[in-house]
Amino acid sequence: MRQLAFISARLGVPRFLVLLLILVFPLLPPFFLSGSAASAAPLALRQVAPGVYVHFGQHKDFEAGYDGDIANIGFVVGSEAVAVIDTGGSYATGMALKEALRAITLLPVRYVINTHGHPDHIFGNAAFMDDAGGAAPPQLIAHQRLPPFLARRGDQYRRNLARQLGDGAAGSLLIASTGGIGVGERLLLDLGGRQLALRAWPTAHTDHDLTVFDRASGALWTGDLLFIGRTPSLDGDLKGWLAATDALAGDRATLMIPGHGPVTRDARHALARQRDYLATLLRDVRADIAAHRDMTQSMATAAAAERGG
């Protein structure tokens, strides 16, 4: 009781309020806590090039044990600031990425870049917006078509996440940029002695794909324009994705960081594998349409021989 009286006197509040706080605080859910009280175990990171850090998502799908951690996410560190590239599939995953980042650098996060709006890449945005340590929150950057995409899909994504994660979905808000980069436009971001070149693509994997090229290391974050060791999933235009795959094959990047799967310095091989799959998928679907086959069955069997590579 002496300790209770001491705390009450120091805080200038009645004893019953101090006692209430002591009793209730341990019962608060994690998303009511701030700072280290709500911190998650940091994600495992790999430095794939100087100043370029990647967390590799697990090889799972959205139904088999999904926990918000299946996409490749990470960040690039300059001399003045940091850019985060994709934030994971939940607030908890985003917080774990932030914890890992803070173990490496205390530089401010100046930018959060979304390569596209699929839920496994974007639900962690809120983790970087809710606690800027007194500094201005980072600028959210994405393709200009991402905000309308999330306006259409957002409710569905939130319902799905609540079903998949239950209480683990707490704090997972869809926070998107208010503007964005238009198709064919490029944007240079300065992190201090380090520039990132962003490119907005025509419809391919989605209608709002964005890539991030780190000029200092030659590393290209492709988002889901490239899958390695995973079956590519289409939410855009198949012919457009083939065109984007061909364009990436001519890119000057020395290292490619895909949206899913391991990084590669042999991008031509990885892109050729993906192109074979997409081209076979297009051929098989066209053949099924010509034969008036059921499209549900077609999507289950098309390019079956190419999957898994």
Where are the regions a protein language model picked out?
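Bacterial N-terminal signal peptides
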Residues: 16-34
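Boundary at the C-terminal end of the N-terminal hydrophobic targeting segment
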Residues: 37-40
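Conserved beta-strand hairpin/beta-sheet module of binuclear metal-dependent hydrolase folds
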Residues: 47-102, 210-222
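Active-site neighborhood of phospho(di)ester-bond hydrolases with catalytic His/Asp-centered motifs
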Residues: 85-87, 110-118, 141-143, 221-223, ...
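Active-site environment of divalent metal-dependent phosphoester hydrolases
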Residues: 91-93, 117-123, 147-150, 206-209, ...
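Active-site HxH/HxHxD metal-binding segment of metal-dependent hydrolases
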Residues: 99-184, 188, 283
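Core dinuclear metal-dependent hydrolase active-site scaffold
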Residues: 181-214
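Divalent-metal (often Zn2+) His-rich catalytic cores of metallo-beta-lactamase-fold enzymes
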Residues: 242-293, 301
